[in-house]
Amino acid sequence: MASPEPRRGGDGAAQAARKTRVEANSPLPKNSGSLNEAEALNPEVTLSSEGSLNLEDILYLEDTGDLDETLYVQETEKAEEALYIEEAMQPDEALHVEEPGNPEETVCVEETTEPDRIQFVEGPVEPGKPTSPEHVVYEGETVTRAEKSNPEESLRAEQSPSMEENLSIEDLELLEGRFQQCVQAVAQLEEERDQLIHELVLLREPALQEVQQVHQDILAAYKLHAQAELERDGLREEIRLVKQKLFKVTKECVAYQYQLECRQQDVAQFADFREVLTTRATQLSEELAQLRDAYQKQKEQLRQQLEAPPSQRDGHFLQESRRLSAQFENLMAESRQDLEEEYEPQFLRLLERKEAGTKALQRTQAEIQEMKEALRPLQAEARQLRLQNRNLEDQIALVRQKRDEEVQQYREQLEEMEERQRQLRNGVQLQQQKNKEMEQLRLSLAEELSTYKAMLLPKSLEQADAPTSQAGGMETQSQGAV
């Protein structure tokens, strides 16, 4: 905001009058231009008098600097004309004192030695004291002026009320022009405020759209995550069922393998027992062959004996050989029958067990082959399920990574928006503080204007009474001269 320039003339006088009236004739360390520092136009007066901005409308403003720049109004071209009142008096003129008739009224002392300053001192006048020597206190300095009893100065004292009246009227006109400019500035600020609110709405819409888009992306990611988790749970259930089935098949396979091993052990035992029986049969066959050889030899001997000439001894020997041959045949038949009775059931049982073991082995091998054939698709399915599970885990990891990135981005955007909100709040607080200052300035200006008007009203009345008294004095002088 541009620094205001000090005002001259009537502003300093009005301020001095107001200060002396409030502080009961105490010296003030302020110059006549101190009021002008609060006089500069601030757009926050418009906001405080017309209405405050809505906080929800400015929460999403990008930069508070633009708001401050648009709310400031430059000084008008005729600021010096509105703030300065030039005096038309000569610097050689002395201090003029106006004494009202009532001793309790204030005395207005106007010093015209300096063209840039008008000093007003208000204070009660004691009826017994003369007012010719007067002490003026302003900014810690005491000014003593003695009124001269010169007829020229008395004429100047008579002419000063009319000049003060002219200056006061011009000051009022300038103040009215200043207030008109303030009203125009207020209207312009209202238009700028509406434009800024419209820009705020336009700036807030993309941010809201981005936030909604981020929310939709997060919801879609959560949906994909939930769907992937459901698929993962379904695949885990299928894998569990396949594992149970595979465990059952493996258990049955182990049981069949145990039975096969038992049958193989039985077959091995049967083979050993068969070898024993075969060895026994071989021994018996050898014994039988030996017996047959012995029998053939005896038979040949007996035949030779029979072919020999018969004799008594030969007959006896022939009978004996026949008896021995019959015994031998009976013995062979009995031994063969005993062997058949002893080993044939065992051999038949062994053959039956061998056939049953062979059939069981073939059946077990067929079942094992079938189980292997059935296990191959299960293994392929298990491999496929493991591959799908790995792919799903990779997809879940990617979805989680994407979700984390989106959440991080959303958090960063949220932090940026919170930072903007804090900046906007600080800007709003500063703006409210400026509004309060401008409201105080407006109130002080209104109070000063009312004080100035109250000062001008008795002066105008005194100036209206002064011509009549002056005319009466001239008549008395003319009569005295006659």
Swiss-Prot record:
Residues 466-482 have a biased composition (Polar residues). Residues 1-10, 144-156 have a biased composition (Basic and acidic residues). Keywords: Coiled coil, Cytoplasm, Intermediate filament, Phosphoprotein. May link the dystrophin-associated glycoprotein complex (DAPC) to intracellular desmin (DES) filaments. Interacts with DES and DTNA. Induction: Up-regulated at the sarcolemma in individuals with various forms of neuromuscular disease. Atypical type III intermediate filament (IF) protein that may play a supportive role in the efficient coupling of mechanical stress between the myofibril and fiber exterior. May facilitate lateral force transmission during skeletal muscle contraction. Does not form homofilaments nor heterofilaments with other IF proteins. Residues 170-204 are annotated as: Coil 1A. InterPro entries: IF_rod_dom, Syncoilin. The keyword Metal-binding does not apply. Residues 232-309 are annotated as: Coil 1b. Residues 1-42, 144-165, 460-482 are annotated as: Disordered. Belongs to the intermediate filament family. Residues 350-458 are annotated as: Coil 2. This is Syncoilin. The keyword Cytoplasm applies. It is found in: Cytoplasm, Perinuclear region. It comes from Homo sapiens. Residues 310-349 are annotated as: Linker 2.
